[in-house]
Amino acid sequence: MTKSHCRNKLIQLFLDYGCEFRSYLKKFDVSHIKIIRIIDCYRNYFKTINNELRDVQTEIIYKPDSLRSNIFKIQWEIHNGLSYDVIKKHNQKLFDYFGIQDEEKLIRIIGLVE
């Protein structure tokens, strides 16, 4: 096994397990360093996005016009005995999105078991 091959394996282990690799940077080739820095940049970028998503997750989940809210609304309407035609009339956009053409498919997609 060559020295370069060993370094490649070591880099792969660092990246697979999220280990701290900055102290080893001077021992790698320039091409390895570029790859490591790009991956490190992406890791920081995704960490930032993840933190931002945590800040707005309740807004996404509980937004009145969200897909989730509309599905809950349809479940509520079915539970309260509204007819298929009335539900379809009030939720045509969602019916078109899911390709719902009949009551059986509505029940299957919404996930209700009667």
Swiss-Prot record:
Protein name per its UniProtKB record: Uncharacterized protein R889
Taxon lineage: Viruses, Varidnaviria, Bamfordvirae, Nucleocytoviricota, Megaviricetes
